[in-house]
């Protein structure tokens, strides 16, 4: 089947105005991403505030994104939950709306074991028959997909990629030894480790800060493919990432999408917006990044 994309996929933030999804801002944002070298758009994931979106909102957001993208890049829908049947239902709706692939997080709260993960993911994949990106983010789920389990899952024709947010490079090396990387893609789920991830053979990143600087990330990936040393090129991005670490994702990046006019910096409870002083510091860091010609 090959890789869904290579380079930068954007973990799309959801713009809100007065606590409602701002679909006009969403359309502008997606057009901006397409114009600035995004290679894939990932909808309704962690950065989208998935837990506080209704099923209807998720479907509407996906439909808008699919329509704006119009086949130019793959659209990946975050449809995974800790309920296998609900995940199937959401994934089938995503397929009908026009998603090119689905992303499935490991079950959370009602944690399972590795055999349960295999059964969960393969049941969804076989029911939906779309390319699947597994999402391993133990910091949020307290559950990990062992490398051996990923190897087993990769035997399923639909399970073709992993978003790896472990920040564990021993895990990455284990995966590389077990998988056919011509057919199975490894995407970083951590913006701040992409130099090492790219240097060690990763196929791309599903990025938060690429909501505002997709071209910078894609340029970094392209430079690595040309065997360039990308550490110095990454340094301005790292400085911006340090500023973004002021609070949990997606609170800070919403302040930056607001700067670009894609909604405002609203988030839904239980998330709360940045303190004014923190927001101002972050906006200053972003302005310095842009003044440096890095975007």
From Swiss-Prot:
Compartments where found: Cytoplasm
GO cellular component: cytosol
Organism: Staphylococcus saprophyticus subsp. saprophyticus (strain ATCC 15305 / DSM 20229 / NCIMB 8711 / NCTC 7292 / S-41)
UniProt-annotated catalytic positions: 135 (proton donor/acceptor), 163 (schiff-base intermediate with substrate)
Stored PANTHER family: 4-HYDROXY-2-OXOGLUTARATE ALDOLASE, MITOCHONDRIAL, DIHYDRODIPICOLINATE SYNTHASE
Gene Ontology terms for molecular function: 4-hydroxy-tetrahydrodipicolinate synthase activity
Role description: Catalyzes the condensation of (S)-aspartate-beta-semialdehyde [(S)-ASA] and pyruvate to 4-hydroxy-tetrahydrodipicolinate (HTPA).
UniProt entry keywords in alphabetical sequence: Amino-acid biosynthesis, Cytoplasm, Diaminopimelate biosynthesis, Lyase, Lysine biosynthesis, Schiff base
Name of the molecule in the record: 4-hydroxy-tetrahydrodipicolinate synthase
């Amino acid at each position: 089947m090959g890789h869904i994309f290579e380079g930068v996929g954007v973990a799309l933030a959801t713009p809100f105005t007065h606590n409602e999804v701002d679909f006009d801002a969403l359309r502008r944002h997606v057009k901006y991403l397409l114009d600035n070298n995004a290679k894939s758009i990932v909808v309704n994931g962690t950065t989208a505030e998935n837990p506080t979106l209704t099923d209807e909102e998720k479907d509407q957001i996906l439909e808008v994104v699919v329509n704006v993208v119009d086949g130019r890049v793959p659209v990946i829908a975050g449809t995974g939950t800790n309920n296998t049947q609900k995940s199937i239902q959401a994934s089938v709706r995503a397929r009908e709306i026009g998603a090119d692939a689905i992303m499935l997080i490991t079950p959370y709260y009602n944690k399972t074991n590795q055999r349960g993960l295999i059964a969960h993911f393969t049941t969804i994949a076989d029911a939906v028959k779309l390319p699947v990106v597994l999402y391993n983010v133990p910091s949020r789920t307290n559950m990990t997909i062992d490398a051996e389990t990923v190897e087993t899952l990769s035997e399923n024709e639909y399970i073709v990629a992993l978003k790896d947010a472990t920040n564990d490079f021993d895990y990455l090396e284990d995966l590389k030894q077990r998988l056919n990387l011509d057919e199975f893609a490894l995407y970083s789920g951590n913006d701040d480790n992409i130099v090492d991830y790219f240097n060690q053979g990763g196929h791309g990143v599903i990025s938060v800060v690429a909501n505002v600087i997709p071209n910078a990330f894609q340029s970094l990936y392209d430079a690595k493919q040309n065997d360039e040393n990308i550490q110095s090129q990454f340094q301005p991005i790292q400085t911006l990432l340090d500023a973004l670490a002021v609070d949990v994702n997606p609170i800070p990046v919403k302040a930056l999408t607001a700067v670009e006019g894609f909604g405002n910096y609203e988030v839904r409870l239980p998330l709360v917006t940045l303190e004014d002083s923190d927001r101002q510091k972050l906006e200053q860091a972003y302005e310095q990044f842009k003044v440096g010609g890095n975007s």
